[in-house]
Structure formats: C-alpha cells, structure tokens
C-alpha cells in the first residue's frame, strides 16, 4: 500500500484560484456588484432628493413672501435673485428643476436603481445581474446627468424654464 503525503496547505484548489484583493476604488466606487450599485443609487438619489427639497423650499418662500428677500438669498447670483428677491425667470427655473430632480433623479433612481439592483436579484437568488458593467455605467451616467442638470443654474442663460408641464 502506498501513502500519499499531503501538503500542509489546503489541497483543494490551485494556488492561482485566489484573486488579488480589490482596492477601495474597485470595490466601492467602480464596482460591478449589484448590491454596491444599489447602495450607490440610494445615496445619490437621497442627495438629489435633498436638492429637490431645497428647491421646493425656495418655491415655498416665494409663494409665502412674494417680493421679499429670502434669508441667505444673497449668495444667489444677481441674474437669479438680485438682493435675494427672486426674478420671475428664476421662479420658473425653480419649478422646472424641482420637478425634474424629484421625478427623474430622486424617485425613479430609488425605485429602479435601488429596488431593481439591490432587492430583486437577492429575492430571485441570482448571484449577479446579467450585464454588470452596463449596470455600473447606468449609475455613473445617471449621476453625471443629474450634475449636468444642476450645473444649469450656473450657465449664463440659466436652467430650463419649461414650468411644471415639462414633466407632467
């Protein structure tokens, strides 16, 4: 009878089977894991929910105290609110951007990004999404689109002025 000497390490698998540890950027920022992407969508949509809420507070200030300067409104450019008093064009921008941010950058990412990325694959028992890189790009493009929309306040012509009918 022959005896086989086993190595002291785990004999089930090759040495090359282990992956190198992922960096913070690979694991949490540019991740293809559906759970991490769902959490990213959660934080970004909560940020845009805060932005939309701040826009709503400005709308309500104008409705409650028309023609009065808003507290802290001095930080707004003169093209939007000279002396903290809202111009009519800026008010329409607020209404348009509030609705756009709340519908397209807060509510939809919460439903589609968080629910579809985080919960549904776990409930189905799937290990990952079908196309994880496309899933990652969908998050980054949604974030980029929201930041570009937010930057619309800082261009010379201002943000879109379509009113509430644009998203209704």
Predicted regions and their residues:
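...captures the hydrophobic TM-helix bundle architecture rather than a specific catalytic motif
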Residues: 1-168
